[in-house]
Amino acid sequence: MTGFRDQLGVHAQALVLRETRNNLLTSNIANAATPHYKARDIDFGAELARASGNGTVRTTEARHFAAGGPAARGEALYRDPVSPSLDGNTVEMAVEQMEFAENTLRYQTSLALLNRRISGLMTAIKGE
């Protein structure tokens, strides 16, 4: 018999990681005018693979972080800017806003899938 956590699948882990990423992205946006602030992010794919116990991650783009590096240990990575500012700040507002919007949408999707999974489990428990 599998546990309740197993029944939720990867969605519960994804929500936690999306929240962590959301906090990093909002911190980046809040510090957009702070001199020498370095934009941070996590490698979501590597973190999710680590959290789910699957150590292999497929990268489809050259800009993806390699698995097994700092992100695999749960550390935030520094993002390399396309055009760094003169004051050493690496936050690019357009990039941060786009990443924030995408992360929020994916968070909501994971939440909806998790809610659907829980509703299905409740239906099975009630015997309806």
Swiss-Prot record:
GO CC annotations on file: bacterial-type flagellum basal body, rod
Stored PROSITE patterns: FLAGELLA_BB_ROD
Keywords, sorted A to Z: Bacterial flagellum
Places the protein is found: Bacterial flagellum basal body
Biological processes per GO annotation: bacterial-type flagellum-dependent swarming motility
Protein origin, superkingdom: Bacteria
Record flagged with keyword Methyltransferase: no
InterPro entries cross-referenced by the UniProt entry: Flagellar_basal_body_rod_CS (IPR019776), FlgB (IPR006300)
Record's function text: Structural component of flagellum, the bacterial motility apparatus. Part of the rod structure of flagellar basal body.
Subunit structure, as described in the record: The basal body constitutes a major portion of the flagellar organelle and consists of a number of rings mounted on a central rod. In Gram-negative bacteria, at least four rings, L, P, S and M are present, whereas Gram-positive bacteria lack the L and P rings. The rod consists of about 26 subunits of FlgG in the distal portion, and FlgB, FlgC and FlgF build up the proximal portion of the rod with about 6 subunits each.
Family stated for the protein in its record: Belongs to the flagella basal body rod proteins family.
PANTHER family reported in the protein's UniProt record: FLAGELLAR BASAL BODY ROD PROTEIN FLGB, FLAGELLAR PROTEIN
Protein name: Flagellar basal body rod protein FlgB
Source species taxonomy: Bacteria, Pseudomonadati, Pseudomonadota, Alphaproteobacteria, Rhodobacterales
